[in-house]
Swiss-Prot record:
InterPro entries: UPF0212. It comes from Methanoregula boonei (strain DSM 21154 / JCM 14090 / 6A8). This is UPF0212 protein Mboo_1659. The lineage of its organism: Archaea, Methanobacteriati, Methanobacteriota, Stenosarchaea group, Methanomicrobia. Belongs to the UPF0212 family. It comes from the Archaea.
Length: 112
């Protein structure tokens, strides 16, 4: 059975964020706290989006009225899964249990 790298996207809501950098830092920190110790093997980083006009990469975070929405990328290696679908279900289950009500979206599954 092969191993897989599963990439998920999550949306993180932050209150009282003064700057974009603060919001991203808080989101990554809070995600890390929730993932540790049950899913400490999950990599967390700030998400990026492609601009539809110029195709440059933009931060997937926005701050309005001291409230932020930050897109995070979560990567997890899944070992000995039966298929890509099985690997994605395992990753969503493990990460979803740790993050509780945070929305998750599957972005990619790669065989290692």
């Amino acid at each position: 059975m092969p191993d897989y790298l599963v990439t998920l996207e999550s949306a993180w809501y932050i209150k009282e964020a003064k700057t974009l950098d603060d919001a991203i830092g808080i989101a990554i920190s809070e995600a890390g706290k929730r993932l540790n110790p049950s899913a400490k093997f999950v990599e967390v980083e700030a998400g990026m989006l492609a601009c539809p006009f110029c195709e440059r990469e933009l931060s997937s975070a926005i701050v309005v009225a001291d409230t932020a929405l930050v897109g995070l990328i979560l990567e997890m290696k899944v070992f000995r899964a039966e298929s890509k679908e099985h690997a994605s279900r395992i990753a969503k289950s493990v990460i979803g249990k740790a993050l509780h009500e945070i929305p998750l979206k599957l972005l990619d599954v790669q065989e290692l």
